[in-house]
Amino acid sequence: MASRDFLGVFGGGGGERRAANGSGSAVGGESDEIELSLGLSLGGRFGTDMSPDAKRARLARSSSIASVCSVSAADGDPSPAAPLPLLRTSSLPTETEEERWRRREMQNRRRLEARRKRLERRISVGSSSVPNKPGREDGGDGAVNRLQLRRSIGSQGSSSANPQDQGPDGSAICQSTEARSPSTSDDTNQNSALPPTASTGKPLNGTVTQQSPLRTLGSLTMRTSSTGDIGKIMMDMPMVSSKVEGPNGRKIDGFLYKYRKGEDVSIMCVCHGKFHSPAEFVKHAGGGDVSNPLRHIVVNPSPSVFL
């Protein structure tokens, strides 16, 4: 019985049974039932009742898109409204974003202004340093003129000292040389303005400077000969070392200094570079006072240690 009622409700027979029981509507042929045909409607509502006498409040579907709007229950026209333009989403308010752009433009203007001021300052400094250069050039020309005057005075003195350098009319040759070509005179002025070379060794103030010795073939030959002399000297002064036994004994190297007949024997130690007698050399090695110090000294004739 329950299954028949259930099928009757969904099959359309429930309406006749309800009309027979007195629960139907006053108007015949019009039913107040909601259609459950699962048909999609505008606004996201299912089973919309299009009858004008349906006055029940229905829930409208909410939407996150502004262009989707629900159909009002009071309006019978199911056509949607005109879509609204999509708004731009922003994480910052409009006022804050405008303030940020305004601040950035102001910073850019300040930077451009500072850059322009620096450029103007550089140009002004460069223009102020330009007038000083002619003064320096004038000073250089004055020095050149003074050198030319000294040179002309010296040339006149030399021409007066040497009568053969004078012409038949008695005028000095240096006066005629002044009428040379401008290029030759300019070269002379440049040469006179240059400082004296190292070959003369005499600067303008008259003091003589000591020249640095040049390495020539003769100096190399002298160096080679001196090296050979050192080898000969080392052959004459052989290498010696101490031979001391005991807890305080140590080996000290030295060489036998060249001595002549009748002179005392002296040994120079390598560690301190001092001259000692044989007894002092053995004592320096930690042997103490010995009766025959020459027995504690070993002679090594090889001079390769010092070469």
Curated annotation (Swiss-Prot):
Please give the InterPro entries that the UniProt record associates with this protein: Ninja_fam, Ninja_motif, NLS_NINJA_AFP-like, TDBD
- Bias (Basic and acidic residues) occurs at 99-111
Family, per the entry? Belongs to the Ninja family.
Q: Name one GO cellular component term.
A: nucleus
Name it.
Answer: Ninja-family protein Os03g0419100
According to its UniProt entry, the protein's GO biological process terms are: negative regulation of DNA-templated transcription; signal transduction
Q: From the UniProt entry, list the residue stretches annotated as the region Disordered.
A: 1-30, 67-225
Stretches with biased composition (Polar residues): 153-165, 173-225
Report keywords, A-Z.
Answer: Nucleus
Record carries keyword Nucleus: yes
Q: State the species of origin.
A: Oryza sativa subsp. japonica
Biased composition of type Low complexity is found at 84-94
Q: Say which domain of life the source belongs to.
A: Eukaryota
Locations listed in the record: Nucleus
Q: What is its main location?
A: nucleus
